[in-house]
């Protein structure tokens, strides 16, 4: 169902994402992407408790039999900001031998999941969530972020997953035995955490998509060449995916 429990008629995908109109996500998942392809994307990003034969159309709304972890969600969102390249979340970045040679370098382990331009368009829409949608209040003063809110019926679970050009963070709030949350503070937790880890970082804008797409309900064409420095920024700064869990 939609986050506000109402139907708003036809709308752009940007509006649907920013206002959490889940009927749009469900229709795209069922009719355009197809459940087989949609679940396939998740399997390619290390979601370990999802099985194709147990997934229904409810998967478009996060309705999985065994659920997902914050680590898996952080890895998936990091794939978007990394231009479609999935890297398995890990605590180990690099291991050097006594000669200083890298014998383990996790930054070089990646696999292609999404098209680069599609990821940049998705980031642009997730940016709207933070600036004027359900995620207003999540952005720290020292970073530019994009992300998405998530809730279950009766507010028994609350999520916020988001990222900057430097870090990706997934927040979950809930009880071991599900019951309604008295208050939801995922946005505040995300904002405070991201503020702390960006204290020594410069604000960096997200990379821009090329081509025609809908922005702020108007069709625009944007073509922006990326400099070598812009292209490599993400590869140098997002080798670690911080993940945090919060429970009341």
Predicted regions and their residues:
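Active-site-adjacent helix/loop patches that line small-molecule binding or acyl-intermediate pockets
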Residues: 1-49, 54-82, 128
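A penicillin-recognizing enzyme superfamily signal
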Residues: 18, 67-229
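Extracellular mucin-like PTS domains
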Residues: 221-246
């Amino acid at each position: 169902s939609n986050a506000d429990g109402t139907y708003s008629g036809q709308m752009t995908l940007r509006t649907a994402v920013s206002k959490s109109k889940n009927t749009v996500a469900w229709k795209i998942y069922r009719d355009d992407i197809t459940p087989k392809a949609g679940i396939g994307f998740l399997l390619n990003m290390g979601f370990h408790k999802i099985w194709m034969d147990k997934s229904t159309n409810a998967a478009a709304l996060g309705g999985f039999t065994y659920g997902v972890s914050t680590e898996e969600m952080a890895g998936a969102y990091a794939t978007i900001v990394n231009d479609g390249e999935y890297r398995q979340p890990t605590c180990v970045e690099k291991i050097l031998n006594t000669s200083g040679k890298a014998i383990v370098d996790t930054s070089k382990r990646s696999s292609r999941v999404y098209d680069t331009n599609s990821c940049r368009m998705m980031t642009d829409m997730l940016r709207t969530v933070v600036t004027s949608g359900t995620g207003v209040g999540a952005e720290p003063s020292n970073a530019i972020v994009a992300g998405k809110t998530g809730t279950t019926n009766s507010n028994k679970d609350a999520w916020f997953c988001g990222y900057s050009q430097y870090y990706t963070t997934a927040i979950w709030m809930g009880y071991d035995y599900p019951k309604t949350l008295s208050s939801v503070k995922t946005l505040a937790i995300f904002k405070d955490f991201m503020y702390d880890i960006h204290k020594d970082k410069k604000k960096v804008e997200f990379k821009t998509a090329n081509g025609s797409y809908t922005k702020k309900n108007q069709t625009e064409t944007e073509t922006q060449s990326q400099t070598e420095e812009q292209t490599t920024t993400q590869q140098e700064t997002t080798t670690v995916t911080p993940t945090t869990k919060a429970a009341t």
